[in-house]
Amino acid sequence: MLTTNRSDASAATGIGRRTLLGALPLAGIALAMPSLVRATTGTPLEVWKDPNCGCCHDWVLHMEAAGFTVKVHDTGNNAVRARLGLPQKLGSCHTALVGGYLIEGHVPASDVRALLQQKPKALGLAVPGMPIGSPGMDGPAYGNRRDPYDVLLVARDGSTRVFKSHNGKAST
């Protein structure tokens, strides 16, 4: 009678214990890959801004640091803002699109994440003007000054309500 070290199941499949043990690390890597891909790709965000605007560039860096994958159009933002239906009075120096929502101005990444999680029926978020202390307007050139400001939820009809108030302390 011929004896082997294989169990009946491994003999039937031709897969030995060593082969199986060697494949386990590869299986672990394969299972981890989707999360690795998600971690490196981030949430896509498209931005229209003036090529010479430093605060817009700093806001883009803020969004990238928060895990967004940013595509920048250095063509200005007036045309895209008008095309998307944002009232001029809510305008700022850059306009973005993420997850079907418009983001106008220096909106903190945490507020954009909250918007994407809550999924309200709205045009998007806006921080009119350029409040000092908001992301992108918070560098050393501003002397660590942080003014209070509101992030507005903009309805499709152009009306607004406060989405989140920032009291002048460090925003995320």
Where are these regions (language model features)?
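Thiol-based oxidoreductase modules, predominantly thioredoxin-like and allied folds used
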Residues: 70-80, 90, 98
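Solvent-exposed loop/turn segments at secondary-structure junctions
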Residues: 52-54, 77-79, 102-103, 131-133
